[in-house]
A protein has these predicted regions:
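Non-heme di-metal
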Residues: 1-148
């Protein structure tokens, strides 16, 4: 089995987890009175769902017929205040931007998956946008300039 298939499965699981965490984080932000942050968590969750769907489609293209993929994954378990959740989201998006997607893109290209390699590189850019958005929200929250 090619390494790219395993990488895509890991990315799919990561995006699926992020989507769920962000919906959980949105509820906390809303409960704490941060409507803007809650909305951005929800919007980003939908974007992560789109990423997961595309990755799942790539799994279908690369896997054998009834193949079940077994992978090892980490589960980020931060579930705290809005500030703590933003920090956790920033850490996750930073990993995807600086390590995961660049590494997966390079491997896909090495294995001859040019379109997939380019798509993974593009996903790194999208994740960088998420990271920057969360960094700005955290900065505003820490400075007390967040809309409530």
């Amino acid at each position: 089995m090619k390494e790219t298939l395993i990488n895509i499965a890991k990315a799919y699981v990561g995006e699926s987890q992020a989507r769920n965490r962000y919906t959980f984080y949105a509820k906390i932000a809303k409960k704490e009175g941060y409507e803007q942050i809650a909305e951005i968590f929800l919007t980003t969750a939908e974007q992560e769902k789109t990423h997961a769907k595309r990755l799942f489609e790539h799994i279908q293209e690369l896997k054998a017929n009834d193949e079940e993929l077994k992978i090892e994954v980490s589960v980020p378990a931060v579930y705290g205040t809005t500030a703590e959740n933003l920090k956790a989201a920033i850490a996750g998006e930073t990993y995807e931007t600086t390590e995961m997607y660049p590494t997966f893109s390079k491997k896909a290209l090495e294995e001859g998956y040019e379109v997939l390699g380019k798509r993974l590189a593009a996903m790194a850019i999208a994740e960088k946008n998420h990271k920057e958005k969360y960094e700005n929200l955290l900065k505003n929250l820490e400075e007390g300039t967040t809309f409530i």
